[in-house]
Amino acid sequence: MGKLTKNQKLVLSKIEVGRMYTFKEASVVIKEITTTMFDASVDMDVRLGIDPRKANQMIRGVVSLPHGLGKRVRVLALVTPDQEGFARNAGADYVGLNEYIEKIKNGWTDVDVIIAHPSVMGRVGILGKILGPRGLMPNPKSGTVANDVSTAVKEVKQGKIDFRVDKGGIVHTSIGRISFTPEQICDNAKEFMATLLKVRPAVVRGIYIKSVYLSSTMSPSLRVDSKSVDGD
């Protein structure tokens, strides 16, 4: 292992080895141990006591973070011509249908979220092999296939995010930026945890939340006590 830099030593000095932090404490410490010169992402990793190979234990959902994500979310609205004005007024960055289907076929996926009206899904379905692996395929369960495209766009712009468990039983998501106040980070983290608890499958027995870690881009992870979601 190479010699630690001054910043690395400072960061490690602020972390108590073996300690499990409350959400409130972790939200303060994460700002103290982040030394990047850019506005780093604040992330959460939650290991669940489920078997993601079983369909009735597949965790997926949406959550509207009270303080948003602190970054611009690029939204593509795939709609018919009569709906384009509503989508644009709601804040969609890209609006259309056939031209964007062709662009995506040719490899363009420079967006964060794609929202589609149900009436166009017959044409959008052919993009599944391209959009699916990137987590961009519109889906009714995540609210990205919607009759009210205008509302769906506004919700995404205001901080609504889609999450799902990976093959290892872990849910990973961004909950904000390091420029947020500790209170904003804590609020977003608790809202995400509360949503995870709501979508617990009825068939799951035993420990549901196995571990929770809070980190930022290039920072060490802080272990968080999941029970502190109801308090400090």
Curated annotation (Swiss-Prot):
Disulfide bonds: none annotated. InterPro entries: Ribosom_uL1_bac-type, Ribosomal_uL1, Ribosomal_uL1-like, Ribosomal_uL1/biogenesis, Ribosomal_uL1_3-a/b-sand, Ribosomal_uL1_CS. One of its GO terms (cellular component) is large ribosomal subunit. GO terms for molecular function: rRNA binding; structural constituent of ribosome; tRNA binding. Gene3D superfamilies: 3.30.190.20, 3.40.50.790. Keywords: Repressor, Ribonucleoprotein, Ribosomal protein, RNA-binding, rRNA-binding, Translation regulation, tRNA-binding. One of its GO terms (biological process) is regulation of translation. It holds the Pfam family Ribosomal_L1. Part of the 50S ribosomal subunit. Belongs to the universal ribosomal protein uL1 family. Binds directly to 23S rRNA. The L1 stalk is quite mobile in the ribosome, and is involved in E site tRNA release. Protein L1 is also a translational repressor protein, it controls the translation of the L11 operon by binding to its mRNA. This is Large ribosomal subunit protein uL1.
